[in-house]
Amino acid sequence: GNYFSELNLEYETYIPDRKKEGYGPSIDGFKKLIDKKVKIIFTVDCGTLSFDAINYAKENKVDVIVLDHHQSEIKLPNAFSIVNPNRLDDKSNLQYLCAAGVSFMFLVSLNRELRKINWFSKNNINEPNLINYLDLVSLGTICDVVPLIGLNRAIVKQGLKVLKLKKNMGLKTLMDICKIETNPSIYHLGFLIGPRINAGGRVGKCSHGANLLLNKDPKNSFRLASELDQ
């Protein structure tokens, strides 16, 4: 979301209610997005085997890009693209990435392709510095309990440095509420910050965590973080 904001593109976020809709994409969820006239749907941490929902989007002329890391099967949905290091035909050797890591690598590739066609200069937009997102990527990496090897280790090492700068308003507010006064660590991500962000989904406020991480208003951040801290 923050990336699209930097590109001056409009976007919608949709977090399924896990009690009513389950964890993955659903036809009902996609219908809500399509009714809002979206042109493309990204699924994150899900979608590799969501045949029905993706077929529904295709029938409505909306492309779907899947950013996932869950195990796949030989047959895959008719999506525009399925970016998943655990596809049976994948040769990246990045099977250990979580969905946040997969999404980050997608943005790295997207940035590179946009740079090649001079998209940033043509649209008078500064190229996003993706390092600034590594606090969020490291949060996802730690909370998904994936091995801290290879690229994951590098992501978390750099991400903790970015987290220390408190550039993300939502994370900054959570750190203040958690009274994290030392240099942030893996423990802080996994046991203090992460559980609070996930808490919204367990109490019927499934969008609170995402809204907090996308929010740039201090007062709104404090309200959301306080509710997640209860």
Model-inferred region functions:
Residues 31-99, 104-121:
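Active-site cavity-forming subdomains of large catalytic enzyme subunits
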Residues 1-41, 45, 59-61, 78, ...:
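Hydrophobic helix-and-loop "lid/oligomerization" segment in the mid-to-C-terminal part
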